[in-house]
């Protein structure tokens, strides 16, 4: 095997069909191509031209070099110790390149799974625990910890974290902080005694479908603290980039690997236990209540968890069933303690919103609970009064009702 690769793979004529593909798709193809080129010591363009030449010359199937090349490459990947899924992905990408360049491939024997190394299935015991997360998170710099908390409490993927913005964070939470300038808003949101849930619209990377991402109070506190930390950095000159989680995903991967080794968390399913995607799995496993409590109020269904992480709806369901963000927020408030690491929270429905507060029995929180209760009762009374007015108007008719209103206003 000699090393040779195309100087500018992305510009290769063979990859024109990938022009409008996502970054992830392009990355997946490039990984397979580089291995294929390196193994054969030829560029992908040379390999495709060779196959097209054989096709033009009508070489019999049993003498085709392209078949030998693909099968030899498959054997190399097996001997290299790659797992079944990775080998299958690489092979499918290479075959796809040939076919997209009008090379007709004859029947190829499917990959024999018995020849391939298989990783152990990841079980519940392999999922990170709250105690393990509480050991690892304080060892991260604040901006890195903020990204981790978005995955832990929001179930976001490493890629989805890239699309959160400071502007959305400030504006969508303005109803709570009610501050005019960004720094004052961040200071309020960074205060642990001001817990709020943030719900924001994102697009799931895999499917391209929008969904409502929900981040818990601890994630909001940490993100706000991280932005204040960034604001004070000399290199930022007291400015803030609009990218909310200002840590590159490759940096996140590297730091998680370092911490996994440092803390001795080991591996599961052939991968480190402490890695970005494992934080998303923690959210999916724990938020359903399966790890902590079997009380009815702390349990939600698998379908509801799927919807929180942007999965689950078919195209038909997505056409007819529209997600109510308020319902999603209430649902999250019910189970937020399942993915909270340092605090316990209570929640209260107020009109069309849900407010959360620390459940610590301090004087300040008792006062807050009392205020929330009074406000909730007042809103309920107004709602009942509004319903009675509507009923009266329906009974009397619009004309009589308007006359009564005019008389009342004139009398006052």
Residue ranges of predicted features:
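N-terminal core-binding DNA-recognition domain of tyrosine recombinases/integrases
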Residues: 12-24, 30-122
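Alpha-helix N-cap/helix-start motif at helix boundaries, enriched for small hydrophobics
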Residues: 29, 94, 147-148, 159-164, ...
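DNA breakage-rejoining catalytic core of tyrosine-based enzymes
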Residues: 116-135, 189, 207-218, 234
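Basic, Lys/Arg- and aromatic-enriched nucleic-acid-binding interface segment
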Residues: 130-162
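Conserved tyrosine-mediated DNA breakage-rejoining catalytic core shared by Y-recombinases
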Residues: 164-222
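Short, polar N-cap/turn motifs at the start of nucleic acid-interacting alpha helices
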Residues: 170-171, 272-273, 293-324, 329
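Active-site/catalytic core of tyrosine-dependent DNA strand-transfer enzymes
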Residues: 214-271, 282-283, 289
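Catalytic-site neighborhood detector that most strongly recognizes the C-terminal catalytic loop/helix
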Residues: 309-364
């Amino acid at each position: 095997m000699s090393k040779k690769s195309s100087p500018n793979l992305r510009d290769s004529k063979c990859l024109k069909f990938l022009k409008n593909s996502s970054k992830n798709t392009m990355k997946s193809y490039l990984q397979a191509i580089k291995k294929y080129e390196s193994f054969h010591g030829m560029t992908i363009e040379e390999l495709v031209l060779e196959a097209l030449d054989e096709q033009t010359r009508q070489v019999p199937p049993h003498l085709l070099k392209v078949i030998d090349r693909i099968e030899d490459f498959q054997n190399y990947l097996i001997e290299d110790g790659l797992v079944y899924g990775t080998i299958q992905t690489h092979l499918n990408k290479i075959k796809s390149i040939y076919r997209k360049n009008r090379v007709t491939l004859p029947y190829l024997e499917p990959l024999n799974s018995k020849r391939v190394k298989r990783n152990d299935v990841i079980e519940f015991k392999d999922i990170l625990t709250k105690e393990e997360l509480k050991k690892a998170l304080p060892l991260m710099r604040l901006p890195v910890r903020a990204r981790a908390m978005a995955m832990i409490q929001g179930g976001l993927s490493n890629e989805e974290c890239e699309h959160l913005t400071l502007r959305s964070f400030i504006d969508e939470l303005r109803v709570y902080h009610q501050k005019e300038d960004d720094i004052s808003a961040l200071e309020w949101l960074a205060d642990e005694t001001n817990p709020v849930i943030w719900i924001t619209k994102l697009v799931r990377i895999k499917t391209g479908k929008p969904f409502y991402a929900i981040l818990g109070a601890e994630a909001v506190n940490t993100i706000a603290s991280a932005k204040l930390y960034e604001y004070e950095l000399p290199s930022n000159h007291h400015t803030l980039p609009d990218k909310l989680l200002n840590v590159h995903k490759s940096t996140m991967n590297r730091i998680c690997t370092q911490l996994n080794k440092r803390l001795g968390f080991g591996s599961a399913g052939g991968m480190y236990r402490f890695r970005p995607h494992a934080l998303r799995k923690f959210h999916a496993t724990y938020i359903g209540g399966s790890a902590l409590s079997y009380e009815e109020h702390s349990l939600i269904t698998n379908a509801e968890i799927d919807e929180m992480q942007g999965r689950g709806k078919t195209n038909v369901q997505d056409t007819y069933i529209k997600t109510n963000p308020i319902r999603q927020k209430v649902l999250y408030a019910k189970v937020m303690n399942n993915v909270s690491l340092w605090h316990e929270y209570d929640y209260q429905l107020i009109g069309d919103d849900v407010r959360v507060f620390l459940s610590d029995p301090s004087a300040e929180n008792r006062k807050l609970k009392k205020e929330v209760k009074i406000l909730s009762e007042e809103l309920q009374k107004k709602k009942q009064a509004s319903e009675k007015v509507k009923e009266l108007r329906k009974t009397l008719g619009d004309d009589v009702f308007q006359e009564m209103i005019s008389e009342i206003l004139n009398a006052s």
